[in-house]
Amino acid sequence: MTLAYETVSENRSFGGIQGVYRHQSQATGTPMTFAIYLPPDARHGKVPVLWYLSGLTCTHENAMTKAGAQEWAAEYGIAVIFPDTSPRGEGVANDETYDLGQGAGFYVDATEAPWAPHFRMWHYVTHELPELVFNNFPLDREAQGITGHSMGGHGALTIAMTFPERYRSVSAFAPIAHPSESDWGRKQFAAYLGDDKAAWKRHDSTILMREKGYPGEVLIDQGASDQFLDLLKPEALAHAMAERRQPGTFRMQQGYDHSYFFVQSFMADHIRWHAERLG
């Protein structure tokens, strides 16, 4: 695995550095771009890490510029990493619809044509990118949390429940909560994973919550006026958490929709939540 990368940009932000970087990914076989916010504390030693996984159509840039994370990350001394949501470029399979292909990797490793050669976002986010950043930036490998929005919330929850020993905290904003029973999920799983329903289950946070849960507390925020509630299916995850007696908090936020205005509004709560658990 190559650990080389190039700097695209670095900007001062709340006393820290918001950087954008590019590297050649072995997982996807393409160049990949990612962003890291390093708080001022990173000048003095390793800092805890919060992975932020973005939603459909997003790149690394959307949350970096719209989620309002930097101010709170600086205050609580935590780094935030913003990966891209899929491989991109010529020769990479795509689809005319917004919710499949480039910008819609769904945080799975595709096994089906034409997606399998490049769409390995599970491996990229959980193995390749961590190795690169922990070997090149002042980040504490033993203090990792993960969060995300929409498709990224789905990714954060499934990854945390699969690797609970690695991610000491988890939260989500309006996650796609039951993808194997939603049009945001069935279409993508069929395309990327084929008929392997066991693989579908491994990437469904409601099913994972029923079967294994998470050893710590979980924080979920969901806008009650979200225009995609029927696709997100938050009630399925809420019921699974209740049936399991999963420690945590599931908040329906009155009047909030699915936008980054919603994410901004509760970003401070989420970063504080992770900072308290990552120490």
Curated annotation (Swiss-Prot):
It holds the Pfam family Esterase. It comes from Paracoccus denitrificans (strain Pd 1222). This is S-formylglutathione hydrolase. NCBIfam families: fghA_ester_D (TIGR02821). One of its GO terms (molecular function) is S-formylglutathione hydrolase activity. Keywords: Hydrolase, Serine esterase. The keyword Lyase does not apply. InterPro entries: AB_hydrolase_fold (IPR029058), Esterase-like (IPR000801), S-formylglutathione_hydrol (IPR014186). It comes from the Bacteria. It catalyses: S-formylglutathione + H2O = formate + glutathione + H(+). The active site is at residues 150, 226, 258. The gene is fghA. One of its GO terms (cellular component) is cytosol.
